[in-house]
């Protein structure tokens, strides 16, 4: 599909699929189409922080410092299969890696969206009344319960299909964030820390497709320093 960035890399174990990302323009187009939708703010958070789906769904308001423009990743929501019942029930657990617990910066646009979302959530809570189950979650069902990861995935895939954009998974927003950051010249160690990777080597291995653009940017930067405007 035209405009889709599909990169075949030797990914870490368990990640043998093609690495798929959107361009900045495609991401902007999708976010614009989500305005007013329940997915708008969680997608914006993922797209501007590189957080995993479970980390986004596990966010609590106590993890956010809106004045400082940062959030703390402390837990993740998943839905593993119960061996006794065969059901996939939402459970909270530790982030995926040892360095998964981290502090993540957020741009002003995301902070503003979260402030608006908090007000809307408070209004919805009053409408539900005493039946509202307060788990302190940033993103929850209308009754306050955690959003099932599979249901969230289905909603996201539905909106992507309707958008006319190349098909991506929610996790590909994380890949898109990292790729755009590296191509913009953000140091790989900084990106690695924001993503919660165990080490910078993992970041460079996964996103090696971004290195040529980084090298070109470095060359232009050095040339500007040496030769100035001449």
Residue ranges and their predicted role:
Residues 1-2, 25-27, 44-77, 81-83, ...:
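Short, charged phosphate-coordinating catalytic segments
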Residues 3-9, 14-21, 32, 68, ...:
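C-terminal secondary-structure termini that scaffold catalytic or DNA-interacting sites
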Residues 27, 111-114:
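A generic structural signal for short hydrophobic patches within well-formed alpha-helices
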Residues 28-41, 49, 104, 120-130, ...:
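Short, basic (Lys/Arg/His-rich) helix/loop patches that form interaction surfaces
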Residues 40, 44, 176-179, 201, ...:
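A broad detector of short, well-ordered amphipathic alpha-helices
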Residues 58-64, 192-198, 208:
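A short, basic/aromatic helix-end/turn motif that makes direct DNA contacts
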Residues 115-119:
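Arg/Lys-rich amphipathic alpha helix in sigma70-family domain 2
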């Amino acid at each position: 599909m035209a405009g889709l960035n599909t990169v075949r890399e030797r990914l870490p174990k368990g990640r043998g699929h093609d690495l798929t990302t959107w361009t900045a323009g495609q991401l902007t187009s999708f976010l614009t189409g989500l305005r007013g939708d329940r997915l708008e703010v969680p997608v914006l958070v993922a797209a501007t922080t590189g957080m995993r789906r479970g980390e986004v769904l596990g966010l609590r308001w106590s993890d956010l410092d809106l004045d400082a423009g940062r959030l703390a990743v402390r837990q993740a929501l998943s839905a593993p299969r119960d061996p006794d019942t065969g059901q996939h029930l939402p459970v909270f657990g530790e982030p995926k890696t040892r360095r998964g617990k981290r502090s993540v910066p957020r741009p002003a646009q995301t902070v503003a969206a979260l402030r608006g979302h908090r007000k809307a959530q408070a209004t919805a809570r009053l409408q539900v009344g005493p039946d509202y189950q307060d788990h302190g979650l940033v993103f929850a069902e209308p009754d306050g319960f955690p959003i099932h990861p599979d249901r969230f995935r289905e909603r996201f895939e539905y909106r992507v299909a309707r958008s006319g954009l190349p098909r991506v998974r929610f996790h590909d927003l994380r890949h898109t964030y990292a790729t755009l950051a590296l191509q913009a010249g953000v140091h790989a160690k900084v990106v690695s820390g924001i993503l919660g990777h165990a080490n910078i080597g993992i970041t460079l291995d996964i996103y090696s497709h971004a290195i040529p653009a980084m090298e070109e940017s470095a060359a232009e930067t050095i040339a500007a320093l040496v030769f100035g405007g001449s």
